[in-house]
From Swiss-Prot:
GO terms for molecular function: 4-(cytidine 5'-diphospho)-2-C-methyl-D-erythritol kinase activity; ATP binding. Pathway: Isoprenoid biosynthesis; isopentenyl diphosphate biosynthesis via DXP pathway; isopentenyl diphosphate from 1-deoxy-D-xylulose 5-phosphate: step 3/6. This is 4-diphosphocytidyl-2-C-methyl-D-erythritol kinase. The gene is ispE. Keywords: ATP-binding, Isoprene biosynthesis, Kinase, Nucleotide-binding, Transferase. It comes from Clostridium botulinum (strain Loch Maree / Type A3).
Length: 280
């Protein structure tokens, strides 16, 4: 069984506190985009086999797809195993939920293969044990995600909007970025209510004005390349530009495909991983 595993971007990301166990409390607007990996799963007699077209992708428990399969098999006492083939298109360690969406897609395919009676709610319970972005990736679309990622409220779909996405030639550790964030020193928070209202009113310019990611407080100081990319996007006609997740991917939001194509061509001269895509 073959399925697409779609990436996401954050239209906003706010950190509003920290739990005693160290987890950060989040308030973020998440959006699925039409950039995807391909996941194919076949039933085998025993075990979990991962294969991927990128050699640097781990094929053991470090891979969230493996972890998803293992949790599913254990939870439902399934004696069979699975072979998972991954074709990677989503950049790795990029703030685009590449690993999380692969894991979510594995859970959905395994439901189809083994237990079609399982609800999305139940799948999301398993997903939360894998990572904060995985529950959102089960549903996709446009949603407000709160807590540690488990509280998901769908909103009006912000679909068919044009994005140009740049992933610079380095990766960032989500854990390191959050560990370097000083929550008490976040002085400007996203106006998430205004952002949602802008989406509901189809006001693209207002959406662009209200996009904000507080993790940029950490990354923009340390990585000047990210400042340059954001500035370049605005110079090349983007309505707004923001880092997605914990980075380092940065996207520009456009209202015109010709401008987006010119921007893509310009960025492609400087960076290897550049994409034109749309929200879905």
């Amino acid at each position: 069984m073959l399925s697409k595993a779609h990436a996401k971007v954050n239209l906003s990301l706010d950190v509003i506190g920290k739990r005693k166990d160290g987890y950060h409390l989040l308030k973020m607007l998440m959006q699925t985009i039409d950039l995807y990996d391909l996941i194919q799963i076949k039933k085998i007699k025993k075990g979990i086999i991962i294969d991927c077209d990128r050699e640097y992708i781990p094929k053991d428990r470090r891979n969230l797809a493996y972890k998803a399969a293992e949790l599913f098999l254990d939870r439902y006492n399934i004696d069979s195993g699975v072979r998972i083939d991954i074709t990677k298109n989503i950049p790795v360690a990029a703030g685009l939920a590449g690993g999380s969406t692969d894991a979510a897609t594995v859970l959905k395919i395994m439901r189809d293969i083994f237990r079609s009676d399982i609800s999305n709610k139940e799948l999301k319970e398993i997903a939360l044990d894998i990572g904060a972005d995985v529950p959102f990736c089960i549903e996709g679309g446009t949603a407000l995600c709160e807590g540690i990622g488990e509280k998901i409220t769908p909103i009006k779909n912000f679909k068919n909007q044009i994005l140009v996405l740049v992933k610079p030639n380095f990766g960032l550790s989500t854990k390191d970025v959050y560990n370097n964030l000083k929550v008490e020193k976040i002085y400007i928070h996203p106006n998430t209510t205004k952002l949602i209202q802008s989406i509901e009113e189809d006001n693209l310019k207002s959406v662009a004005r209200n996009m904000r990611n507080v993790l940029e407080n950490v990354t923009l100081r340390k990585y000047k390349t990210l400042n340059s990319i954001k500035s370049n996007f605005i110079e090349l006609g983007a309505l707004g530009s923001m880092m997605s997740g914990s980075g380092p991917s940065v996207f520009g939001l456009f209202d015109d495909m010709l401008k987006a194509q010119i921007c893509y061509d310009n960025m492609k001269e400087k960076y290897k991983e550049v994409f034109i895509t749309r929200t879905i």
